[in-house]
C-alpha cells in the first residue's frame, strides 16, 4: 500500500515545565497502579510563568487545555493561527472563533486536505460553511498529512502538544500541551 507522509511539530522543554509534564504522567500512572508501584514526584525548584503545561485529567474532570484555548481566543485582538489534524470543535470553542473573526481578528485554521481519518475529515468539513461566512480562513495542507497540534494568538501566546481542536482531545482524553506566553517563541 501507499505510505502517508506525516508533518508534525515538537518542542524540547527544559526547566520547570518538565516537572509539570512528569507530574501529569505520574498522576495517570498512580491512578492505575497499586501503592507499591506508585511514581513519586516533588515540587519544582523554580517557576517560569512564561511556560506552563496544561494536562487533561479525565478521572478528575479537569480539562485545562480547552480552557487555555478559550481564554486565548477570547483575548485575541489581531490574529489566531490554529494547526490541527482533526478540527471538530465543541459549540463554545466554535462560537469563540466565530466571534473573534466577526470582531475583526484574522482567524486562520489549517487542517490536512486528507487526514488518516476520513470520518474526521467529513466531520471537520461540516464546520467550514459557518467559519467561511464569519470570515475565518481555512487552509488545507496538501504536502503531507499534517499531524501538528499548534496554535498562536497575537504573536505572544502559543501552544504545542498532543491535543487536537476536537471534542475528544479537549473534553475527554488524556492530553498534554505546553503553553508559552512569549513573543520570541510565538
Stretches with model-predicted labels:
Residues 2-3, 7-186:
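Charged, low-complexity intrinsically disordered terminal segments
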